[in-house]
Curated annotation (Swiss-Prot):
Record GO terms (molecular function): transmembrane transporter activity
This protein's record includes keyword Transmembrane helix: yes
Stored Pfam families: MFS_1
HAMAP family, A to Z: MFS_MdtD
Protein's name in the database: Putative multidrug resistance protein MdtD
Classification lineage: Bacteria, Pseudomonadati, Pseudomonadota, Gammaproteobacteria, Enterobacterales
């Protein structure tokens, strides 16, 4: 990348900062949830909506982001994304009730949904194809640093300032990023086909209705009849989309994607698998602070080994898959994640806190292997003309499953705690014990899906040899 013009390098820095803001926000909030609950006068059992509202909004808006960038221009959409994200951060910091905070997180999620995919599209347009991989490695590095800093930084701000600062720190970065985008970034546009608004609205309503209904009366305040209407409406919208997409070449996501068996298995496995693993970033800081009495900063520091393990293992994932095959790796990593989840709970409740960083490191390693393998399996056999659509659908499902996972974790805590959760008490230990047992079962279930993956590693071996010869 040394031969790139100076203005292109600045444009890559802008995209990198966008990636950093979005990645930091996905992890910095988790550590602050118990403090937010105390400040807002809410039960900690309701605070999962702060996470769900953001992640679900990202899932809903992702399919529209690429089309908007092509139609309106990458600079205009990237600028809008940063502005919405920054305004959402400001409104989050000013929120005095949970409902206000959830509404502000929705606005923040709209910006976050456009920031990363439009950033990828921007890189594709401003650098030569032979330098695309190097450029993407550069802009995604801050996105990897964000999850590493997020939990500890969130805990530090909460403990020594207030939870409002986890959102206020986005303001100077957002203002600088928005100004730099207008000044330096070109506004590339492309001829686009008509956007499938009907399909988009059906999928958006279906995802939102079913996720909200999952929270039940405890979070929504709706009557049983109202919840039933949400379930019926969400299910009907999903079925209507399937009917709408049948034989429709302009559909948001073509059903022909599912003619590829590995895509179908990988997508369904990703949905189920990320529901389980999506519980962990929410549950871990809540358990450490409410169940064990850790300070916010201490809880944030305890999350760092998980991120380090996730980053460190990535270098050998390809070799592991080439050696053992997708099926064995996915089944083994899924069952290992369930076991390490139980181990974390057991070690914590036994008071062996010195072992927790080791368990968290192993958890991050297992989770990373599983994520990377799931992603590759899902997309590897798709025809070139369907790769972009398949990748967009996978990205949407990843966000949706994480929102479902957080919702289910909140549901389990509420069910076992009878909607009451006192900090660092014997009752809290029992509540978390049964919650973690159920979580481990949910995490393990996708192994049944992955057991159906064809046991064929030849294609990966060819890819690995090409990579070695090119290096």
């Amino acid at each position: 990348m040394t031969d790139l013009p100076q203005n292109v390098r600045w444009q890559l820095w802008i995209v990198a900062f966008g990636f950093f803001m979005q990645a930091l926000d996905t992890t910095i909030v988790n550590t602050a949830l118990p403090s937010m609950a105390a400040s807002l006068g809410e039960s900690p059992l309701r605070m999962h909506m702060v996470i769900v509202s953001y992640v679900l909004t990202v899932a809903v808006m992702l399919p529209a982001s690429g089309w908007l960038a092509d139609r309106v221009g990458v600079r205009n959409i990237f600028f809008t994304a940063i502005v919405l994200f920054t305004l959402g951060s400001l409104f989050c910091a000013q929120s005095s009730t949970l409902n206000e905070l959830v509404a502000a997180r929705v606005l923040q999620g709209i910006g976050g949904a456009m920031m990363v995919p439009v950033g990828r599209l921007t890189v594709m347009k401003i650098v030569p194809r032979d330098q695309y991989m190097a450029a993407m490695t550069f802009v995604t590095l801050p996105g990897q640093v964000g999850p590493l800093l997020g939990p500890a930084l969130g805990g530090l701000l909460v403990e020594y300032a207030s939870w409002h600062w986890i959102f206020l720190i986005n303001l100077p970065v957002g203002i600088a990023g928005a100004a730099a985008t207008l000044w330096l970034m070109p506004n590339y546009t492309m001829q686009t086909r008509r956007f499938d608004f009907s399909g988009f609205l059906l999928l958006a309503f279906g995802m939102a209705a079913l996720t909200i209904a999952l929270d039940g009366y405890r979070s929504t305040g709706l009557s049983p009849a109202g919840l039933g209407a949400l379930v019926a409406g969400g299910s009907a919208a999903t079925l209507l989309y399937l009917w709408h997409a049948r034989g429709n070449e302009r559909a948001l996501f073509s059903l022909r994607l599912f003619n590829t068996r590995t895509f179908s298995l990988g997508l369904f496995g990703s949905l189920c698998g990320r529901i389980g693993s999506g519980m962990l970033p929410f549950m871990t800081p809540v358990f450490l602070q409410i169940g064990l009495g850790f300070s916010p900063f201490h809880a944030g520091l305890m999350m760092m080994p998980m991120v380090l393990g996730s980053m460190g293992i990535k270098r050998i994932v390809v070799q592991v898959v080439n050696r053992f095959g997708y099926r064995r790796v996915l089944v083994a990593s899924t069952l290992a994640l369930a076991l390490v989840t139980l181990l974390f709970m057991g070690v914590a409740l036994a008071g062996w806190y010195w072992l927790l960083p080791v368990v968290m490191l192993f958890q991050g390693m297992v989770n990373s292997v599983r994520f990377s393998t799931m992603n590759t399996l899902t997309l590897r056999d798709l025809p070139d003309e369907m790769a972009s659509s398949g990748n967009s659908l996978l990205s949407m499902v990843m966000q949706l499953s994480m929102s479902l996972g957080v919702s289910i974790a909140g549901l389990l805590l509420g069910a076992f705690g009878h909607n009451q959760l006192a900090a660092d008490s014997g009752d809290a230990h029992g509540i978390f014990f049964w919650t973690y047992l159920c979580m481990a079962l949910i995490i393990a279930l996708p192994a049944l899906v992955f057991a159906r993956v064809p046991d064929d590693i030849s294609k990966n071996a060819v890819i690995a040899r090409r990579k070695r010869s090119a290096s």
